[in-house]
Structure formats: C-alpha cells, structure tokens
Amino acid sequence: MRIGLVEFLLILAIASLTIGPQVALFVDRWLRRANRVNARAARRRAEYAAQAAAERDALLKRFRTASTVFGVCILLALVYTLVFRPIDTPPQAYDAPAVRQDTGAAQTALAADDKGTLDLGEYQNVDCIRARDGLVYAAACDGAALKKCSSDLVRTDGGHTAAVLTVDGELTGFAFDGSGDLWLSILTPGGGSLCRAAHDSWGTAVEQVVTQIDGAPLGAVSAVEAAPDGRIYFAVAAAAGAADGLESTLRTELLAHTGTGCVYVYDPAARSVQKVLGGVAGAAGLALSPDGSTLYVSDLANRCVWRVSADAQDLTAGGKNCSSLVSGLPGYPGALAMDPDGTLYIGYRWARSSWLEKNAGSTLLRGIALRAGRNLQEKLFGLPADAPCTEAVDTADGSWQRVVSGRGAGSVTALCPVESRLYLGLAGSEKVRSANL
C-alpha cells in the first residue's frame, strides 16, 4: 500500500496531537532538571570561590603579620647590632684637634718612573723599611702566601731581592742595634711580641723577648727603635686585641679614641721593661734623635707627634714633660723616620676625616661605625690624590722643610731616608716608592 503525501501529513498531525504534549512535558522537565543542576553547580563554585578567597585573605593576612614581625625583628636586631651590641673598644668622647694652616714648605712628588723604585717582586704591604751597609731591608708579606699569616724580612740592592727571615704573624717593625742584632715587633691574633734575632743566626732563630706587660699580653705592637746605648724602644698602638692586624687596630683606635697606646723601653743588660709614655690615641710610629736623647711618637687620632726625653718614665701624652713637636697635622700620622741631620719625616696613614672629628664629642655614630665592620670603616678613611702623604720637619726649630705629595699612591706605612732619597712603603703596593729630597 502506497502512502501519499496527504496521508503522510495526516499521520504526522495525528502523532503530534497524540504524543506531542508528552514530549514537550518531558523536554520541559529535563530542562528544569538541567537548570537546577547548573544552579547547584554554580552555587558550589561560588561557595568554593568564596572559601578560596577567604583562605587567600587569611593567608595573606598571616603573611603580612609574619612579614611585619620579621621586619620588626630584623630592625631590632639591626639596632642592637649597630647601637647596643657590646664591643671591646667602646668609643670615648674627645676634643678634635685644630687644623693647621698651610706651611709653605717645598713641594716634592713621588717619582713617577721606575728610577729609584725598588721592586719587591711578589712581596707587598711593606710595614717597615731600613737601610744598612748599602742595602735596603723591608718587612713585607709574600703576595703568593698572604693567607699563611706570615711575614718576611726582605733585603734588596735594587735589582735582586732575597728573604732574610720569615716570622709567623705580621712583622710591623724592625731595627738594627749597635752590635748588629735585629729587633722585631711581631703581631699575631694572640697579641704582640718584641723579638730578637742575633746577627749570626738570621734566618734560623727568632727569640721572643717581651710578650707580656705586668702579666697581661702585649697589645698591638706597631714600631721598634734601637737607641745608641743599646736600649730598645717599642710602641703598642692600643691595648685592644689585634686579631685583624695592625691597620685594623689603628682604624679602630681612630674611631674609638681610647687613648691606650703606650711606648716602652727594654734594657737588654738589665732585662727589664719600663713604660716611657702612655695615653696615646694610636701610637703608630717611633723615631729617635740622632744622639738618642729624644724620642718622638706619632699620635694617630690626635694628629700630632709627641716629644719626650729618651730617659723619661711613665709620662702621659700631653702631660708634664711631654710636649708636641708638631700638631694639627693634615692627616693621621703613622710611620716616622729620622735623618742624620735631625729632620723628622712623618708618613700619613689617612687624610683628616671631617666626619670623624665633627662627631668627636659624640659616641653614637662612632659606635655605629665601630660595630658596622671593616668594609664600612675602610670607606671612612683614605688618602686623596691631592693630600700630602709625607711631610718633613726640622726637629731643632720646628720649621717645615718639605711636603711629599702621593698622587693617589695610598696610605704610607713605612719611611726610610737614605742620603738624597726618601723610600716609602705604601699599603697594598708591591714596590718601595721613592722621592728625591
């Protein structure tokens, strides 16, 4: 039987009238159910999002609280470290010395070429220079073995360099006495010592002579001088420990101004030690007059050079029988050297710091600088290119003879006049520089 178009349309109409409402009802129920499911899912997502937001806010709040607490702790630790932390050398208030006017002395510059310069090879950080029998001796560290905490006494004739002896620690100074024995000031983390090396045993044995004063370890020994009568003078820069070496001790004393530096004399015949001068704020250098009757002591923080009798006992810097040869120096004096004609050469470790002396009467900022550590302290002091590195004064009348400019050479750590030439040791340099006099 064939169904035509009319019959087909009639069948569709009857079917739609019969089952159409049921289909529509089914679709409606399904759509309603789907909407309810979607609504529940949307509510769950909204709840999850709200819960996540609440948890995130709580976490951020806890993090902010922890960050605030951590920041406050760091701030308190920083304040304690820089302001309240106990230190071995608390700063003392003092009166800053006056600033000297220009002396008008003759100007000399360090030799710019290699003429007169002594190349020490791998040796550097010269702490002391002496001349004897046409040879130049220098206390220096081997640049290839700086971490070994040892120093060498080096001898050179200008072309060949040889190590005479090696000591454990920092060889801060040495001097020859009349018999040819060598006297050494040696600094180790445990303290300082005055030692002797007999002229017939150089390179084999170094004898410790003085390691304590009144039962206390010797402080940071900085210089030694041998008098014509055989007595040996040695300086202690400060009473504080010297774990980081002489330069660190001098910087610390410059900031703290404890005034605990002293000068002692050792009598080899009597084997006795006598205090000559105390109350020095950084006894960094010594020199004796040509006849050995007068002792000169550089006072680092007070920017002056004290003059006392070589026979003096237990004097105080600036007190009775202790006068200043020169004062108000343009820098902080360190090494001293005496010419046979009585001219005293003064080497400057650093140029005068206006910041330091502005805060001379206050201990807060200087205490912060002391606690801040070595890196900051090194940035506080320097020797600019236009600052004098060495000056010469006539000890007879106090007149200024010469000013040596360093051209940015750096801190002067050693001086030695030899005839018409002045040899200089500079911090960190592998060469002994010179200037024509």
Residue ranges and their predicted role:
Residues 142, 148-193, 210-213:
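Blade-loop segments of beta-propeller domains
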